[in-house]
């Protein structure tokens, strides 16, 4: 019937693109906003607008049960608003003072880290300090080996992947240091790395653990003589 056809059309162009929004406070007054998307292919745009960080879902909306203000009031982050503007869902992170941010999406999970500007903060003991140049890139179902090649070209490092590194990845990175980007990529695919000078060897984590165990055994055998 025409009514059925109309409802199918409206569903096709507007659907819920979000399943959860959560905030975790950080040690330095910042925090992490994690956004679970309905699927990894939903187009997402992240823009800084003064003391607001605006995340826009293009062509998909926020479901009714998530339309709300989340009063965080934790360090830098005051609140998080979720609403719809036409066919697009909009998540607005309201920040109290000057901030830096980086965002990365792995699979259907979008993570946005908000923190004090570098000059104003001391790294905590648990925090790994990344010093690589920041980059922004997006991959939709691209071979992991191709992504590592692109990263190697960006960094002038030699990134060598073992034969057993395979599979595809969907990933979005915004303003992320390249060495952190590499760690995010490796973690998402259960891969590990070994560094030697300007060469980074990438292997599956299980292989890396076995290799390190063998080396430790050999070292202990030598020491026991």
Show where each model-derived region lies.
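Sec-dependent N-terminal signal peptides of Gram-negative outer-membrane/periplasmic proteins
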Residues: 2-32, 38-225
């Amino acid at each position: 019937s025409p009514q059925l056809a109309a409802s199918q059309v409206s569903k096709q162009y507007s659907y819920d693109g979000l399943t959860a929004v959560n905030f975790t406070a950080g040690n330095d007054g910042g925090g992490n906003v994690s956004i679970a998307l309905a699927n990894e292919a939903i187009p997402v745009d992240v823009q800084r607008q003064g003391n607001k960080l605006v995340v826009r879902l293009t062509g998909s909306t926020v479901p009714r049960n998530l339309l709300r203000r989340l009063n965080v009031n934790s360090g830098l982050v005051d609140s998080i608003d979720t609403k719809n503007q036409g066919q697009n869902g909009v998540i607005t992170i309201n920040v109290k003072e000057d901030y830096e941010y980086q965002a990365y999406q792995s699979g259907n999970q979008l993570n946005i880290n908000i923190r004090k500007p570098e000059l104003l903060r001391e790294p905590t003991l648990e925090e790994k300090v990344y010093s690589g140049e920041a980059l922004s890139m997006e991959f939709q179902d691209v071979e992991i080996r191709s992504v590592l090649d692109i990263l190697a070209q960006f960094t002038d490092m030699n990134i060598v992947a073992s034969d057993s590194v395979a599979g595809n990845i969907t990933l979005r990175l915004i303003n992320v240091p390249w060495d952190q980007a590499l760690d995010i990529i490796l973690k998402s695919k259960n891969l590990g790395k070994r560094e030697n000078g300007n060469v980074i060897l990438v292997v599956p984590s299980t292989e890396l653990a076995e290799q390190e165990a063998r080396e430790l055994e050999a070292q202990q055998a030598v020491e026991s003589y």
